[in-house]
């Protein structure tokens, strides 16, 4: 419908925040066309709505449905198809918004829902800097170990590093160590873009919050995300728990 774009992924009639972004990025070159612009702004509106429904989910239904493809605990909202928390799920809508904004200069997507979604993303990333205090749990029965989180749904223990925790990778497989470095770098960048949008929306407090969080994540990667390889020297780790 006008102002609302729902993009299914493959043969699954659900929308992933990550996949829906990737599925329209190649249309940005045509975003000067009104119909394409409407499609992208409709998707940004739907992504913001989904984040406000549940920022820890990775995939959503078009409409509420009590059908669940998996036996997950705790049971997710009827709007949610799957509730695997992945950092990049929250980064991708901001990534799309920034690319669209840079290409067109349009700001019609900067709605109150988008504003609230930005604040939600920043709040979740900050919460997950100290995962021990997080409300998020995820357990799935009768599945491979990569489809569930150990430790009663909390995942393996992690130390505080300044980075933000992720339950799952972009592949939807569970993180072995809670700090997924590439996704933290993605978050670092998109928080800077979020700060720009926050200022466009007149929210200086949110802009500063996003910038502070971005700097903390960057410092965390510098301190805990590097490894000295005997052959290749200083390289970035893929994942770390910050525990040495």
Locate the predicted segments by residue.
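Short, glycine- and charge-enriched coil/turn segments that flank and shape catalytic ligand pockets
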Residues: 2-3, 34-35, 202-208
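Carbohydrate-binding/catalytic loop surfaces
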Residues: 2-12, 60-84, 135-176, 228-244
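Aromatic-rich carbohydrate-recognition surfaces in CAZymes
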Residues: 13-40, 47-147
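Amphipathic, well-ordered alpha-helical segments in soluble domains
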Residues: 19, 89-96, 183-186, 190-194, ...
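Short acidic/histidine-centered micro-motifs embedded in hydrophobic/aromatic stretches
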Residues: 43-46, 213
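Catalytic cores of carbohydrate-active enzymes
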Residues: 54-58, 126-143, 177-179, 189-244
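Helix-rich catalytic cores of soluble enzyme domains
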Residues: 106-108, 114-166, 170-188, 192, ...
């Amino acid at each position: 419908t006008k102002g609302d774009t729902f993009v299914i992924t493959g043969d699954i009639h659900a929308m992933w925040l990550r996949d829906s972004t990737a599925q329209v990025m190649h249309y940005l070159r045509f975003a000067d066309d009104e119909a394409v612009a409407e499609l992208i702004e409709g998707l940004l509106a739907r992504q913001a709505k989904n984040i406000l429904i549940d920022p820890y989910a990775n995939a959503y239904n078009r409409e509420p449905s009590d059908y669940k493809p998996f036996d997950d605990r705790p049971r997710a909202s009827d709007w949610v198809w799957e509730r695997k928390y992945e950092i990049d799920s929250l980064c991708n809508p901001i990534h799309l918004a920034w690319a669209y904004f840079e290409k067109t200069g349009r700001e019609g997507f900067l709605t109150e829902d988008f504003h609230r979604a930005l604040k939600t993303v920043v709040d979740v990333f900050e919460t997950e800097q100290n995962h021990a205090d997080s409300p998020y749990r995820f357990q799935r029965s009768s599945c491979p170990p990569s489809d569930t989180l150990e430790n009663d749904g909390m995942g393996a223990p992690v130390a505080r590093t300044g980075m933000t925790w992720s339950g799952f990778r972009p592949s939807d497989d569970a993180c072995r160590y809670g700090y997924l470095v590439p996704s933290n770098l993605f978050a670092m960048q998109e928080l800077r873009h979020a700060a720009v949008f926050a200022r466009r929306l007149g929210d200086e407090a949110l802009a500063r919050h996003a910038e502070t969080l971005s700097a903390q994540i960057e410092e965390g990667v510098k301190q805990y995300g590097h490894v000295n390889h005997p052959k290749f020297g200083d390289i970035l780790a893929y994942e770390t728990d910050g525990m040495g």
